[in-house]
A protein has these predicted regions:
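Acidic catalytic/metal-coordinating carboxylates
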Residues: 58, 85-90
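Short loop/helix-cap segments at secondary-structure boundaries that form the rim of catalytic
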Residues: 69, 110-120
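Short amphipathic alpha-helix used as the core "switch/output" element in two-component signaling
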Residues: 88-99
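Active-site residues of response regulator receiver
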Residues: 78-79
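Non-catalytic signal-transmission and effector/linker regions of two-component phosphorelay proteins
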Residues: 1-30, 36-37, 100, 121-124, ...
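Acidic, metal-coordinating helix/loop segments flanking the phosphotransfer/catalytic sites
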Residues: 55-74
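Two-component/phosphorelay signaling modules centered on CheY-like receiver
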Residues: 36-54
Length: 142
């Protein structure tokens, strides 16, 4: 079965798009980005590549999505987010549920690279779609 289906998760702004390629379910990525235009670009790029994408516009929303969706395989999070939870908080809490799950951090501040947890990847803003796909493919869960 090939197709796409948008489902509401009951969280303001949260959305999951389910896409399948050749009958095989894709990796589910939670994208946490508070800047709408960046989030649209990131999720569009990942969806076109066949990933299943769950979106969140804040750290708090990301945590609510994680609690209601246990199928998330990896997280792509901006480090600087609006609200009380930043990208570090999102990754730490996500890894409490899924210790071996990969995390891709994004930031315009290169010094943030040094703080990334082992097994994570850092991508510097601004980035190109190819940078996103390369990073996600390198982190792809087993």
């Amino acid at each position: 079965m090939t197709g796409r289906q948008a489902l509401s998760l009951g969280h303001k702004g949260a959305r999951v798009t389910n896409s399948t390629a050749n009958g095989v379910n894709a990796v589910v990525i939670l994208v946490v980005e508070d800047e709408l235009f960046l989030r649209v670009d990131i999720t569009g790029c990942l969806r076109e590549a066949g990933y299943v994408v769950v979106e969140a516009a804040s750290g708090e929303e990301a945590m609510a999505v994680c609690q209601s969706n246990s199928s998330i395989d990896m997280v792509f999070t901006d480090i600087t987010l609006m609200g009380s939870l930043n990208g570090w908080d999102v990754a730490e809490r996500f890894r409490m549920q899924r210790p071996d799950a990969p995390v891709l951090y994004a930031s315009a501040d290169a010094i943030d690279r040094e703080r990334c947890a082992p097994g994570s990847v850092f991508i510097a803003k601004p980035y190109r779609p190819d940078d996103i796909l390369t990073a996600c493919q390198g982190l792809r869960p087993r």
